[in-house]
């Protein structure tokens, strides 16, 4: 099936997950936006696909929300909290997840899709929606957005079409609501630019 896959462990190293700018950015975003997401969507069980070191999961836990994470590189565990390690499964997102359903109602994946080769894009999305969540938040790097192993940068319409074919519709009203929120000074440009909401 196409070219040989790149090695997740060699690409997403301990230094990648321990990189202060990267980890700090995610923590700031999670601390700021999770309370607002909880208020708007009232999730009961959150799945974070490509959860990295689990900063978002840590914040959801503070709101007494059940959490589950999937991460491809074992190097993410180096900076992961002990509590989060218990609920994160290592899995290559280019393969169909074999675990039983988690019965989640809210799924998210932030800046992961562009790291998945295009030939595996549908598998990645199926992993994201495997439990038929009510709501999906997704960001994916757009064309020309540079980053480590950005192998499938696409415009939003690409992901919208794929999600529609899987039964999920892009919701502009909910996206507008989220975009109306104030953003922390450290908020990266990709958060509002790449965000999509599906229901």
Task: Identify what each model region corresponds to.
Residues 134-137:
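Short glycine-centered segments of the SAM/dcSAM-binding site in methyltransferase folds
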């Amino acid at each position: 099936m196409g070219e040989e896959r790149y090695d997740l462990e060699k690409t997403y190293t301990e230094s990648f997950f321990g990189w202060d700018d990267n980890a700090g950015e995610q923590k700031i975003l999670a601390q700021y936006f999770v309370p607002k997401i909880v208020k708007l969507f009232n999730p009961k069980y959150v799945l974070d696909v490509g959860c990295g070191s689990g900063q978002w999961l840590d914040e959801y836990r503070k709101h007494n929300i059940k959490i589950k994470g999937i991460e491809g590189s074992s190097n993410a565990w180096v900076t992961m909290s002990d509590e989060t390690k218990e609920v994160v499964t290592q899995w290559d997102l280019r393969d169909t997840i074999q675990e039983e359903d988690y019965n989640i109602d809210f799924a998210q994946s932030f800046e992961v899709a562009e790291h998945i080769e295009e030939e595996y894009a549908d598998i990645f999305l199926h992993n994201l929606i495997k439990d038929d969540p009510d709501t999906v938040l997704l960001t994916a790097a757009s064309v020309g957005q540079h980053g480590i192993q950005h192998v499938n940068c696409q415009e939003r319409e690409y992901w919208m079409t794929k999600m529609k074919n899987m039964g999920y519709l892009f919701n502009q009203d909910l996206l507008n609501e989220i975009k109306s929120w104030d953003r922390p000074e450290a908020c990266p440009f990709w958060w509002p630019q790449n965000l999509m909401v599906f229901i």
